[in-house]
A protein has these predicted regions:
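Solvent-exposed, polar/charged alpha-helical surfaces in well-ordered, non-transmembrane soluble domains
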Residues: 75, 89-93, 97, 108, ...
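Envelope-exposed proteins and targeting segments
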Residues: 54-57, 73-77, 91, 124-126, ...
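Hydrophobic alpha-helical transmembrane signal-anchor segments
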Residues: 4-38
């Protein structure tokens, strides 16, 4: 009986063992045969990675080779909590200052943590990101600190395994990602912010591969992004369980091609001069904004383009969109009296008038098309030249009427209004020039004084440059050339002539008229320079109210645009103030800023003086007659005094 029971037990044990071995065998067959390919691919995916190798983004430099934007490669500092063991406090205390983190925060990140993987298994996290964008110099300090880190034990008395723990802790516990990140740096901060723009992180696809890297978001960074960005590389390799590359298992390694460097026409010294003068204007007059553009009339080269308020492209998100907007190309305003140069140029070029021709300005009260236009002074008979000198609204209107709508419209568009200038910056608008069919009977008397038309500050500057450049309109030139990393010129950008708007003879006549604006009898006496003749025009435009017919009381856009030396211009300088306080006439608030910039710019560029100093002009601070915005009957919805 006992033998029978023992036999049954042995039989049951044999059956159980057989079933166990059968299950194990099936599992082995399932893993090694039936699902071998599937599991092999999954294992390969778990280990194999494709690493993006970002090319070095090209530098941006000014015309003198000064660095405006550059890129540095930075580390991502990581930790393996397993190798740190129970030394979190010691490690945190040692490297927290280098990472600019609190010890408590870093201590928490170094703690050992577990998680559930896809199979439901508990795994330990051996890859913890501590800090991104760590400069290479800082990373080296961290490595040196870890290598010399004391732990308060006599390591000579440690066992082999204990000594190995401390060795791995020093050498491997804190590590960096295998591929560095790229950080865009703007050394001069806000100096050229609205020209340079800034970058952000964007995804792009090359050869079927999708990469995420820095990309231009605004300004030159956006417009020249394809040239600056370069071509990414990639690396197909395998990593260990701490996401560190196993170099011997690399399958592909394609080198990136660095981006090109861009050399701008901007001169940092000129830009600084303009920006300092604008900052002073902001302090004195508290305008909503202040802008300045400095151009070489003969070539269209932009030497300075500044707008305040501005922003630091190293941290563009610190300010709102309003401060990041490039008002020189994005904002449109009624230009006011600066637009009188267009109607007078057109009339002279068409032979409709001469500078000596006279018009009756009717003591400052002119009725036309059922409305009344006023001058700021009760002028009687004025010559065409004096109409420019005194900035007479009635005189400009009568010249426009004599010229006619078709001719005026043609010259407006020929001077570039209603079209983008083509400057390589994002966000430029075309302004507003209404087609002839939409003009009212009143338009021909209002457009000559800068009403019923909206322009960008840059359009107005380039129109003045055309007069200074013997009647030839140029395209703004902002990028001088592209170079490779070795300094070889890849592309050279030449000045571009748009069209001959007026004849050279007409341009010379306009220069003579515009010189008188800066005389003691003109509206911009405060723009006069001691050693140089200046030609220019003031503007004081009453601002419209968005969505409301008419103009905003007490809100003005003040302008002065001038060039020097007047007969052989090297520089055209424009200053714009939006809603200045404590004075608003262009000759009163913008002209002195022009003078300050022009004096420093002429000295810096060693421009040859064209006049002998005159004691009466030295330190001239006397204001000449100030032009005022046109006044019409309030029922018209146009500007009033």
């Amino acid at each position: 009986m006992a033998k029978k029971i023992q036999f049954r037990r042995l039989l049951m044990l044999a059956i159980l063992l057989g079933l166990a071995f059968a299950g194990l065998g099936y599992r082995l067959v399932d893993l090694q045969v039936l699902r071998h390919e599937e599991l092999g691919e999954k294992a390969q995916r778990n280990r194999q990675v494709e690493l993006f190798r970002e090319p070095r983004r090209g530098d941006i430099l000014d015309i003198k080779g000064n660095l405006l934007a550059t890129s540095i490669f930075v580390k991502t500092a990581c930790a393996d909590p397993v190798l740190i063991g129970n030394q979190q406090a010691t490690v945190a205390r040692a490297i927290a200052p280098w990472l600019q983190m609190g010890e408590g925060e870093l201590y928490q990140r170094l703690l050992l943590r577990t998680r559930q993987n896809e199979s439901g298994q508990t795994v330990t996290n051996r890859y913890v990101v501590l800090k991104r964008k760590v400069p290479a110099e800082t990373w080296q300090k961290i490595r040196e600190t870890m290598a010399q880190l004391p732990f308060g034990v006599d390591e000579k008395k440690l066992s082999r395994s204990e000594a190995g723990f401390y060795r791995d802790l020093r050498q491997k516990a804190i590590f960096a990602d295998p591929i560095d990140d790229q950080l865009r740096v703007y050394p001069n901060q806000a100096l050229v912010a609205h020209v340079l723009g800034y970058v952000g992180m964007n995804e792009r696809e090359i050869n079927g591969r999708r990469f995420t890297g820095i990309s231009g978001t605004d300004g030159i960074e956006l417009i020249l992004n394809a040239k600056l960005a370069g071509v990414p590389g990639w690396r197909v390799t395998e990593t260990d369980n701490r996401r560190r590359e196993v170099v011997d298992l690399r399958e592909q390694d394609v080198d990136p091609h660095d981006g090109l460097n861009a050399v701008l026409t901007i001169d940092s010294v000129m830009q600084h001069t303009a920006r300092v003068a604008l900052a002073d204007a902001m302090a004195r007059h508290s305008p909503l904004s202040a802008s300045c553009v400095v151009v070489r009339p003969r070539t269209g080269e932009i030497l300075a383009l500044a707008t305040l308020p501005d922003f630091d492209p190293n941290n563009p998100g610190a300010v709102g969109l309003d401060a990041r907007r490039n008002r020189v190309i994005c904002d449109v305003v009624e230009p006011g009296s600066t637009f009188k140069i267009i109607v007078v140029s057109a009339a002279l070029n068409e032979g409709v008038v001469t500078l000596a021709d006279v018009f009756d300005c009717e003591k400052g009260h002119f009725a036309y098309a059922g409305k009344v236009l006023h001058d700021h002074e009760p002028y009687g008979v004025l010559s065409v030249e004096s109409i420019i000198t005194k900035s007479s609204n009635i005189g400009a209107a009568k010249i426009g009427i004599k010229l006619g709508p078709s001719a005026l419209y043609r010259y407006m568009t020929d001077f570039g209004f209603g079209s983008r200038t083509g400057i390589p910056l994002a966000g430029e608008v075309a302004g507003i020039v209404h087609p002839l069919k939409n003009w009212s009977k009143l338009s021909i008397s209002r457009i000559p004084m800068g009403h019923e038309v909206a322009v960008t500050p840059l359009q107005m500057v380039m129109a003045m440059c055309a007069i200074a450049n013997r009647g030839c309109l140029m395209r703004p030139l902002l990028v001088d050339r592209l170079e490779d990393r070795k300094g070889n010129v890849v592309a050279q950008y030449q000045p571009q002539r748009v069209r001959q708007v007026i004849s050279e003879a007409t341009a010379r006549q306009m220069v003579e008229a515009l010189k008188t604006v800066v005389s003691p009898e003109g509206t911009a006496a405060q723009a006069a320079l001691e050693h140089y003749t200046v030609a220019g025009k003031t503007g004081t435009a009453q601002k419209t109210v968005e969505g409301v017919r008419g103009y905003a009381p007490g809100k003005y856009f003040s302008t002065f645009i001038g060039f020097l030396p007047a007969d052989n211009p090297e520089l055209c300088i424009a200053v714009f103030l939006d809603e200045p306080k404590g004075g608003y006439y262009g000759g009163q608030v913008a002209a002195p800023i022009f003078k300050r910039i022009a004096e420093r710019a002429a000295n810096y560029m060693n421009i040859q003086p064209d006049v002998e100093p005159q004691p009466a002009l030295a330190g001239n601070a006397a204001a000449g007659p100030a032009e005022r915005p046109g006044r019409v009957a309030s029922t018209t919805g146009e500007a009033t005094d």
